[in-house]
Amino acid sequence: MIYMNDLKLPWNAQFDAPDKYGLAPGKTFNFKLGTSDNHTLGAWFILSDAIYHTIPFPPSPSAAEQTLSEALTSHPTIIFFHGNAATRALPVRIQQYSAFTSKLCANVLAIDYRGFADSQGSPSEDGLSTDARAAWDWLISNGAKPDDILIMGHSLGTAVASALAVTLSQEAVRFKGLVLMSPFSSMYTLVDTYSVFGLFPVMLPLTMVPHAADLYKSFLQHKFDTLSVITKVKVPVLIVHAENDWDISHTHSDAIFDALLEPYLPSVDALPNEPLSRTKEQWSTYQTQVAKKREVRESLLSRTYMPNFGVMVKFVASGETIVLLKTLTGSHNEVGTLEGTQEVIRNVFSFA
């Protein structure tokens, strides 16, 4: 249920023929990416339109590979970590690559994790983190500058992207930023709220048996706990979620945004667990602290309402910009295809 990597849509894809799936002829370099634990991953490097348009048309099939170095040194690159199921050739993912290469004038590196598509191995939380680092290292080894690389994840890919962003931040590597589209705060929370097609809560049958849900979660091997590590990321962060996402509730994005904001808010002393043991003074102090925290929170936040599109909430702290974009439409899979989302990405991360 977590990975669904056997659902290799589109079926029998020809990854060495990316133009068959809507990308322009000669714009994409299909290659194999090696990992530190000796797995081989399928990957596409897609040229920025700004570079692609300098190549005489029609380009040779190897045009993207031949132009790789120039593309990486002259234009920013987005590493795109997709969600569960399917492959890098899924139409909705192709739409996003095309938009990013045109609207943002960015190159795109899209990989398939181990066990997905034409990649070797079986997926695991540690394995996907290793795959993400391999993608980063490949870009750097081919001439990309860290501050030209935007790390982006969708759904499951947000946990992968966050883990890479945390690792790089701990290594004091300064990169362009982090985008989380339709994220979940942790796998523990997701299993409580996830609904298939927005209609069938996966945990509903277990809630009918006392403690069954807690027992099930205790056996989760893949935690993907973005919420517990996101504050370690030291670059600008954009969180994007559609209010009509019926797969993963937009409350997950609220939780991640609140976690990033929390260190800049005054603390509130906890009240005694037993209501009868609370003194009048404790309750008064608690109310005062809560009011102060709310006041400081509102002073830090700015809101921009965009009619018929959504709302953008932003704060700047420690020199970093943190943005939460809530769109009215886009559902779970298509929020990244919205032109409004792409414009927000362009503005937050100063794409040309």
Stretches with model-predicted labels:
Residues 247-250, 254, 264-352:
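C-terminal catalytic histidine-bearing segment of alpha/beta-hydrolase fold enzymes
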